[in-house]
């Protein structure tokens, strides 16, 4: 049984990460940041802060509602029964993903190669680490426009870890209906085989993925091929790695870092959506609260992320204060946000880059590479991590609104923008106008076009109907070729920057010269912080000449500008008000997780935008969800009947969750009959001795993470503080020591085993060949 451990995890701010790197060159000397649970959750007034995602509660392996995005992408109903169609090779799978993503100047996903990492698959390619590196792929691109349909929203929500040697893809993908990430494994992913898809053992996965979401490391991501030494090792293979470049810049792993950073907040935002609006989660006030949160989120996205939070914004203040009051009742000491950061690890310090195949399996260079598999305790993803931060009531409303804004794709906002603007152009909404005095200068360019510079308004507007603007327009033969408004400040004091002039014209009128402009921000219409569209800008000035405009326009020419705003956003607020008053428990504003497709369907219906085919919520046509095999509650009774000793049964009780699966990673030394298990335990005894002995050392003196790991103990209801002195641990250590003593004739010595190097100790499983 494997889990998807993206081995280079989410970084915090670059400056903080760089400081960590400066203190710990190579990452090898970095100390563990684990802190006791009581310290992590201590809050004000005697209250304990609450985990937004509790690392001790992995949740059920199979989703109780909905399915993963991966299932929706690759389910196949063309056969007699629903199944999966997963393209092979990996480049074909990637091409299928690209079909759902919007083309962009940069690839819509980021990919790195990791030959010597920290995932459970890290030993699978030994000793051919460089020939069979692990691929990590994260989707960070926007969905492709799909007329009449939502399409899948994969950005920050789909991560793949592919290991060619084992034919395994480990998957983390989002479940829209459940509001959580799912952990899956694809087996037999190789030419000629039929891939099988399983949901993974979440308890195993969340031992490292303590945020129940993807991980990535702090900069400088030295396990990836952004590290020049790693890239050089891969290049010596002289093979194609599934179309993935070997030489890459740090922008690629940084893109994965950014994606996992955003993904880490998704479960926390879902918690706020479901519970922050009040204890009566489906009551009328809670529904109205969610309606207001969604309204502000849509306003925020339509306005191009303009900041609308102001002290004099009464609607916002009412919403924020009500939500803060509910927050203080439920989470008086705040919400703890899980830490997805694991330390950077440099696997090739000082290695002479000679291809292992050129020197043989017994050569010191090959042996040195083998030793790079060692993961010190301080760098192990299994180490319990303290919270990344604590969210508190005063910031709750802004956290919820800006978080919800990220649950909508660019295509969703573009579609809504067009629909609202079309309604406004049809005369269905009120308009208001703002004006300003302008100074104009003109200059003829070498290509024959004319540049007209505009400076309108004096200083910053303070209300009323005045606005200010600085920009330029390029004209040819009376038509606007292009232009830009560098700064546009509206009467409410909000300033728009980088506004594009997308069209317009210049003509003579009875009033003089008239310049009419259409404005946009990117592919959407320009909008103010209130969400309303800027329908047009008109500038007029006296022009006594017969020509529309000439290059000798006086330098001090003065004109007058009128900015027209269409009040089209209130239609959205009205639809949300209607939804808030509805009582359907399954609708867009219920206490269920925020479901993008459900919200968009409701908006489209309410605004008369036409039917919308929803993706990734209804799962009735998908193949049955299957969970990968792992021990059940009756296994100990079966083992006792088959002759397992008491101590062997203790091994099963504490270790079977991870080590009795039918997969070799993590080592399944408890898989098989009691006789086979005894042989496995004897083969694994050296490593077991080291791992168990770590519980007797201070945390900063441990060379390896102790086993069972802390989170496994908590799941078993044991105290990490009491476990080191427990008779159960003493019995396990004695059993393993006796195995080693029966081999060597003397008591094992921890220091001697550590001196040999953990990766040179006998492996936990015999060679299957």
Residues of each region from the PLM?
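Exposed regions on extracellular, virion, or secretory-pathway luminal proteins
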Residues: 204, 428, 432-571, 582
């Amino acid at each position: 049984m494997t889990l998807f451990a993206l081995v280079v995890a989410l970084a915090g701010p670059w400056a903080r990460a760089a400081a960590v790197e400066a203190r710990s060159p190579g990452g090898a000397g970095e100390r563990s940041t684990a802190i006791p649970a009581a310290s992590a959750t201590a809050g004000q007034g005697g209250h304990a802060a609450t985990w937004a995602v509790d690392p001790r509660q992995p949740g059920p392996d199979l989703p109780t509602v909905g399915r993963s995005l991966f299932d929706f992408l690759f389910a196949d109903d063309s056969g007699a029964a629903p199944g999966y169609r997963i393209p092979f090779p990996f480049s074909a799978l990637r091409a299928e993903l690209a079909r759902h993503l919007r083309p962009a100047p940069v690839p819509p996903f980021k990919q790195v190669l990791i030959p010597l990492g920290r995932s459970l698959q890290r030993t699978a390619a030994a000793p051919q680490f460089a020939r069979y590196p692990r691929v990590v792929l994260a989707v960070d691109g926007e969905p492709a426009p799909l007329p009449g349909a939502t399409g899948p929203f994969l950005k920050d929500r789909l991560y793949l870890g592919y290991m060619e040697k084992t034919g395994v893809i480990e998957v983390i993908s989002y479940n829209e209906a459940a509001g959580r990430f799912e952990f899956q494994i694809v087996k037999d992913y190789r030419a000629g085989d039929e891939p099988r898809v399983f949901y993974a053992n979440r308890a195993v996965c969340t031992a490292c993925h303590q945020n129940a979401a993807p991980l990535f490391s702090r900069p400088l991501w030295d396990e990836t091929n952004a590290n020049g030494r790693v890239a050089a090792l891969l290049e010596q293979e002289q093979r194609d790695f599934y179309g993935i470049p070997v030489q890459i810049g740090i922008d690629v792993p940084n893109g994965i870092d950014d994606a996992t950073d955003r993904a880490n907040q998704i479960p926390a935002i879902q918690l706020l959506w479901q519970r922050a609006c009040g204890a009566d989660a489906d009551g009328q006030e809670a529904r109205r609260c969610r309606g207001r949160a969604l309204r502000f989120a849509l306003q925020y996205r339509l306005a191009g992320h303009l900041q609308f939070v102001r002290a004099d914004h009464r609607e916002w203040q009412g919403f924020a204060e009500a939500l803060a009051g509910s927050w203080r009742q439920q989470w008086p000491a705040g919400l703890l946000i899980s830490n997805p950061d694991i330390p950077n690890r440099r696997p090739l310090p000082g290695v002479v880059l000679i291809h292992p195949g050129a020197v043989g399996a017994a050569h010191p260079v090959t042996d040195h590479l083998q030793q790079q598999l060692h993961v010190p305790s301080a760098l192990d993803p299994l180490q319990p991590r303290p919270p990344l931060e604590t969210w508190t009531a005063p910031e709750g409303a802004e956290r919820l609104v800006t978080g919800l804004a990220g649950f909508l794709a660019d295509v969703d906002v573009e579609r809504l923008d067009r629909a609202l603007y079309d309604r406004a152009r049809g005369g269905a909404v009120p308009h208001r106008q703002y004006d300003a005095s302008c100074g104009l200068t003109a200059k003829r360019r070498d290509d024959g076009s004319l540049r007209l510079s505009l400076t309108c308004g004096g200083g910053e507007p303070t209300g009323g109907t005045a606005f200010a603007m600085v920009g330029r327009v390029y004209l040819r033969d009376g038509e606007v070729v292009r232009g830009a408004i560098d700064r546009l400040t509206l009467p409410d004091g909000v300033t728009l920057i980088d506004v594009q002039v997308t069209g317009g014209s210049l003509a003579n009128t009875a009033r003089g010269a008239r310049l009419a402009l259409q404005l946009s921000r990117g592919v959407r219409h320009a909008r103010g912080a209130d969400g309303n569209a800027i329908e047009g800008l008109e500038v007029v000035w006296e022009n006594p000449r017969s020509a529309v405009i000439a290059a000798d326009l006086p330098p001090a020419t003065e004109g007058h500008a009128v900015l027209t705003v269409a009040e089209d956003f209130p239609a959205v607020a009205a639809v949300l008000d209607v939804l808030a008053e509805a009582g359907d428990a399954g609708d867009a504003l219920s206490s269920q997780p925020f479901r993008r497709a459900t919200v968009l369907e409701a908006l489209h219906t309410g605004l008369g935008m036409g039917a919308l085919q929803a993706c990734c919520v209804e799962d009735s046509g998908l193949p049955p969800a299957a969970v990968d095999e792992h021990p059940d509650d009756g296994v100990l009774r079966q083992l006792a009947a088959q002759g397992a000793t008491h101590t062997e049964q203790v091994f099963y009780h504490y270790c079977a969750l991870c080590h009795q699966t039918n997969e070799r990673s993590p080592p399944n030394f408890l898989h098989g009959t009691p006789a086979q298990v005894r042989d496995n335990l004897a083969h694994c005894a050296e490593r077991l001795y080291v791992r168990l002995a770590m519980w007797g050392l201070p945390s900063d003196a441990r060379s390896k993470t102790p086993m069972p790991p802390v989170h496994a103990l908590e799941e078993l209801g044991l105290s990490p503080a009491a476990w080191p002195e427990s008779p159960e641990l003493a019995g396990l250590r004695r059993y393993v020591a006796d195995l080693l003593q029966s081999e060597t004739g003397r008591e094992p010595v921890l220091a001697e085993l550590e001196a040999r190097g953990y990766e040179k100790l006998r492996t936990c499983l015999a060679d299957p060949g």
